[in-house]
Amino acid sequence: MPKVALYNQNGQTVGEIELNDAVFGIEPNKHVLFEAVIMQRASMRQGTHKTKNRAEVSGGGRKPWRQKGTGRARQGSIRAPQWRGGGTVFGPVPRSYSYKLPKKVRRLAIKSALSSKVLENDIVVLDQLSLEAPKTKEMVKILNNLSVDRKALIVTDELNENVYLSARNIPGVKVVPANGINVLDVLNHDKLVITKAAVEKVEEVLA
């Protein structure tokens, strides 16, 4: 089982914590990580694209000229696709791009993401993370104490409003509860700052 240092909010080492091998100690599967990121990004797409077809474009109800005798090509509507201002053929329509990978694949992906942070020594485990009031200054101080000067994902055992409000204005820092941890967020941040209680919660679900 991988062992990592346990820190307090002042950046002091207060002990060690053993991480579950099945969650934090597997060989990261890069292909599964790729698939999980593509899935998440697909579900973030708006999908509100739309063009009008010849039935939806305004006008064009009258035949522009008679069928025969003009010497020109026959036309039925000025809103046919070949006309300027005409309808689009097979244009985009609103749709959802979201899809789901199998549950086993999704679980393997988040385990791979967490294990990659341990392998790269980019995980910081805190004994606890609590603030008496929302103070960005205090959160910056805690991150400085922990030598976290890059993009960081902070994971708490449950949604902590004071922590969330204190971190939301810090560029590159995001706070999520343990049940909201996901592959894209873990990979998109350089450091993973996680509380001991959150580690236990994640292990309980994924182990």
UniProtKB/Swiss-Prot annotation:
Region (Disordered): 44-78
Keyword flag Chaperone: no
Record keywords: Antibiotic resistance, Ribonucleoprotein, Ribosomal protein, RNA-binding, rRNA-binding
Gene Ontology CC annotation, any one: ribosome
Molecular function as annotated in GO: rRNA binding; structural constituent of ribosome
GO biological process: response to antibiotic; translation
PANTHER family: 50S RIBOSOMAL PROTEIN L4, LARGE RIBOSOMAL SUBUNIT PROTEIN UL4M
Subunit structure: Part of the 50S ribosomal subunit.
Family, per entry: Belongs to the universal ribosomal protein uL4 family.
Record's protein name: Large ribosomal subunit protein uL4
Lineage: Bacteria, Bacillati, Bacillota, Bacilli, Bacillales
